[in-house]
Amino acid sequence: MSNFFNSLFSDKGEIKGINTQYSVSEIVDILKEEGHSIYLIQDNFWVLKWQGTNVVVVPHDGGDIQFWIMYNDDENRFSLRKVNKMNIDYRVGKFYLTDDEQLGIELLLRNDGNRITKSQIIQGIAALSLLDGLAKKEFW
């Protein structure tokens, strides 16, 4: 590469001057603008609540943003067969069972080298809300 092109890139191969990540406060502001209340903020994650469901939001190095929900259930209503079927039918996120047979939903917004857009964050929350509703319909 010429010196000109080398000057455009950081040592990691990323284009200089383009921020590929949102700060925690920027994502919190986007979620608050959408009417979500954020009630726990740690350095590496925060929790928002909607319709009685806690959603953990984790920003990762590189700009990816992970959303996940865990459901506790003492009645053992979650079956691997149903979870697998939901993963086949709804590929927007991932349903899974933990080792202690609790249901989880994960949705990962991947940074493709550009910045994840505000609309992608809003669509991600909408998709997670849809998956939450499907899980509640299926298991409760």
For the regions a protein language model found, what residue spans apply to each?
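Charge-rich, low-complexity N-terminal segments
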Residues: 1-54, 97
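Short amphipathic alpha-helical segments
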Residues: 19, 23-26, 75-79, 120-127
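Short secondary-structure junctions and interdomain/linker hinges
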Residues: 38, 90-93, 132-135
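Short N-terminal mixed-charge amphipathic segments
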Residues: 46-65, 69-70
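Short acidic, gly/pro-rich beta-turn/loop elements at beta-sheet edges
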Residues: 58, 77-79, 115
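Short, internal acidic amphipathic alpha-helical interface segments
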Residues: 64-107
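Well-ordered alpha/beta subsegment
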Residues: 96-126, 130, 136-140
